[in-house]
Swiss-Prot record:
CDD domains: SIS_Etherase
Family: Belongs to the GCKR-like family. MurNAc-6-P etherase subfamily.
Keywords carried by this UniProt record: Carbohydrate metabolism, Lyase
Pfam families: GKRP_SIS_N (PF22645)
PROSITE patterns: GCKR (PS01272), SIS (PS51464)
GO biological process, one term: peptidoglycan turnover
GO molecular function, a single term: carbon-oxygen lyase activity
Subunit structure: Homodimer.
Catalytic-site annotation from UniProt: E80, E111
Protein name per its UniProtKB record: N-acetylmuramic acid 6-phosphate etherase
Location of the SIS domain: 52-215
Pathways involved: Amino-sugar metabolism; N-acetylmuramate degradation
Cysteine pairs bridged by disulfides in the record: none
Amino acid sequence: MFEKITEQPSLYDRLEEKSTREILEDINREDRKVAEAVSRTIPMIERLVEQIIPRMEQGGRLFYMGAGTSGRLGVLDASEIPPTFGMPPTFVIGLIAGGDRALRNPVEKAEDNTERGWEELLSHGVNSSDTVIGIAASGTTPYVIGALREARRHGILTGCICSNIESPLAAEADCPIEVIVGPEYVTGSSRMKSGTAQKMILNMISTSIMIRLGRVKGNRMVNMQLSNNKLIDRGTRMLMSEFDLSYEDARTLLLRYGSVRIASESMKQKPPKK
């Protein structure tokens, strides 16, 4: 039975009468519940990830879809895949109701359009090798529900992340993830605990997939894009550690090849010094 936990009254009241310290401690107390709630969903996350990996190994893509905070978190996670793991920006794609304008400002009624989500997926050439994950704390967002319903009808793997039990969105997902974090500190403000849970789960999904696809070596981002001085320094220190090089030699090697992984492979192919 569908239960709208995200709209239940807060466990706290008369918030406007509290001190700053009391508010902060209350929020932190509630946030500590999120990690435990996420831990209970690990079997659900595993089931979804294990089905995504073989699809992506064969060239399939991953789509995140959401509105408001949920959509922004999907776009955020997708945007981190190229710099962190060196994958093309078309590998994981985040779609938000209302388009890029909605990343900064609310777009009136964009999330209420049931057809628009599927139309956007079609514009990206979505097909049965891809996966679509809908993100909606309430599990009732029409933009996301409509997209998942059509995706599933076309034989596309579907998953979802929501914070209510047996929601309409979960009914459209092959692999639903229901992370129940309880009432929000500010009643109905699902950008809080529900949003935190979504971010944690998205991190787990994308990171576990990238590791399983060989984009991490040991515990290091050997395929990261060298897009700023901080990352060049990080890559340099990786090579220093692996091959006992000076900072200058490691940096020169890294910049020559433009990739930690390729630089490392080049060193391993060199004949040993006599």
